[in-house]
Design a protein with these regions (language model features):
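N-terminal signal-anchor module of multipass membrane proteins
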Residues: 1-76
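Aromatic-anchored segments of alpha-helical transmembrane domains
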Residues: 24-28, 102-109, 145-155
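Specific transmembrane alpha-helix
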Residues: 61-76, 117-131, 188-202
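Residue-level signature of transmembrane alpha-helical entry/exit and packing/kink sites
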Residues: 16, 93-97, 101, 138
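Long hydrophobic alpha-helical segments that form multi-pass transmembrane helix bundles
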Residues: 141-202
Length: 202
């Protein structure tokens, strides 16, 4: 048994596994409904509603929160040592993981729209920048992400109510348009799991 195996927390693996299963179940359920499946009208139909039900985003939120815990454990030694070389090495580990997940998730989204992998990669890239911050600053960043998302939605609703077009902000498809601007807005604001507000879970 290696040192990594001895120090690995099985609780995180269990949570990650349960969250992944939940994400797959909810995504596949939504896919079947879009293909004409019958959800029914009972209480379970409401609970497992992939868009408005109480479980609609819970598994994805747990998935991102567990990723944040994993980042804390991965970077703990480097942060505690204060060694810039160790910090840089861990930062590049996060960047590589983020780029891989971002690229794979981007192409997967062409086949299966709405997956979290695309945004999961963006979360790791954000974590590579943020992991050296103190807890209070991380809390400020997370709260700012949530408040920023709420402010954007409020502004868009207010503008639309006064007859202004807000589709450039809230609607778009980077996979179709191949636009860097659409890609940025998809990741930050209007995707299924954008950095605003989902960064609060990391």
């Amino acid at each position: 048994m290696s040192a990594d195996d001895r120090t690995r927390d099985p609780e995180l693996d269990v949570l990650r596994g349960l969250a992944l299963i939940g994400v797959c179940v909810m995504n596949y359920h939504g896919y079947l409904l879009q293909r004409g499946g019958n959800a029914g009208n009972g209480a379970l139909a409401h609970v497992f509603d992939p868009w408005r039900g109480p479980l609609s985003t819970r598994f994805a939120a747990v998935f991102v929160a567990v990723a944040g815990m994993g980042v804390v454990l991965l970077t703990h030694r480097a942060r505690s040592s204060g060694d810039r070389a160790q910090v840089s090495a861990v930062r590049w580990v996060l960047v590589r993981r983020g780029v891989l997940l971002f690229a794979f998730g981007f192409f997967l989204d062409w086949v299966w729209p709405g997956t979290i992998l695309f945004f999961y990669g963006a979360f790791f890239l954000a974590a590579s920048v943020l992991f050296t911050l103190r807890c209070r600053w991380l809390a400020i960043v997370g709260a700012s992400a949530a408040l920023g998302a709420a402010a954007i939605q409020w502004w868009a609703v207010d503008r639309a109510a006064h007859g202004h077009d807000t589709s450039w902000l809230l609607w778009g498809d980077a996979e179709t348009t191949r636009s860097p601007g659409d890609l940025l807005f998809d990741v930050a604001v209007r995707g299924t799991h954008p950095l605003l507000p989902w960064l609060i879970f990391l």
